[in-house]
A protein has these predicted regions:
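Short coil/linker segments at helix-helix boundaries
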Residues: 56-105
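Structural signature of alpha-solenoid helical repeat junctions
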Residues: 31-38, 45, 78, 103, ...
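Conserved, well-structured interaction surfaces
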Residues: 1-59, 98, 116-119
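Hydrophobic-face positions in mid-chain alpha helices that act as interaction patches
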Residues: 79-80, 128, 147, 152-224
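Aromatic- and glycine-enriched pocket-lining scaffold segments that form the walls
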Residues: 118-152, 156
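Start-of-helix signal in alpha-solenoid helical-repeat scaffolds, especially tetratricopeptide repeats
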Residues: 10-12, 40, 73, 80, ...
């Protein structure tokens, strides 16, 4: 089905595009402290997108499959192409999938840049990432690499920095709090009346594309 690929294109790659536009518009060396906060957020957004896509597309050996595949290619440990704010149109024509190792280096560099600059972010809304979210992404990153001691360390940092507590069963099952309250999350999406998903009333799986528009606009507006 095209739906799966459409979701990846509309959500993940559009968020990568938004982050790249912001990073291109605000070079760190000439940015004010306020702008550095958004630079940090852009790095966190991009790290999240690539971490998800790397795990989705990476082929790992299993008992039921083997390489080369039916097309005669060995795609073991290949993730997705890396596109940054510095990637030219010409370079994009020959930009193959990168290995797990190269992707891990790239994601870590984004997370380190996010950790360094996101402390300047003045907006408190959890619709944008903050230091606790960066630590949470670090924990997820190290889980992917099976580095469990570091995953544990950063998971604890995320919890301590967020000052949140795990939800109770009552919170999880409630229709008015828990999963439905942004304040219970380290990082989430916040719908407002102007969003298409509210205007159209399409509150179902299809609305995920509209949610991607919202995430896209959160970053893209900073370049205007």
């Amino acid at each position: 089905s095209y739906i799966y690929n459409q979701f990846v294109w509309n959500f993940y790659w559009r968020n990568v595009l938004a982050a790249n536009k912001l990073l291109a518009a605000f070079p760190l060396e000439t940015s004010s402290n306020v702008e550095k906060g958004y630079v940090g957020a852009a790095h966190a957004f991009r790290a999240l997108m690539y971490l998800d896509m790397a795990r989705m597309y990476e082929y790992l050996p299993t008992d039921g499959t083997s390489m080369p595949n039916d097309a005669g290619n060995d795609v073991t440990n290949l993730t997705v192409p890396i596109v940054t704010e510095k990637t030219t149109e010409e370079e994009s024509y020959n930009n193959p999938r990168v290995t797990r190792e190269k992707m891990a280096e790239f994601i870590l560099s984004d997370l380190q840049a996010a950790e360094e600059n996101i402390v300047y972010l003045t907006e408190s809304s959890r619709a944008l990432p903050h230091l606790d979210a960066v630590y949470g992404l670090m924990a997820r990153y190290y889980m992917w690499l099976e580095d469990y001691p570091n995953a544990k360390t950063y998971a604890r940092k995320a919890i301590d920095e967020s000052k949140l507590k795990p939800m109770t069963q009552e919170d999880c099952l409630s229709t008015s709090k828990g999963f439905n309250t942004l304040s219970c999350w380290i990082w989430g999406s916040q719908l407002v009346k102007e969003n298409d998903v509210v205007q159209t009333g399409i509150v179902n799986w299809t609305s995920m594309r509209l949610l991607s528009d919202m995430q896209h606009n959160v970053l893209a507006v900073r370049t205007q």
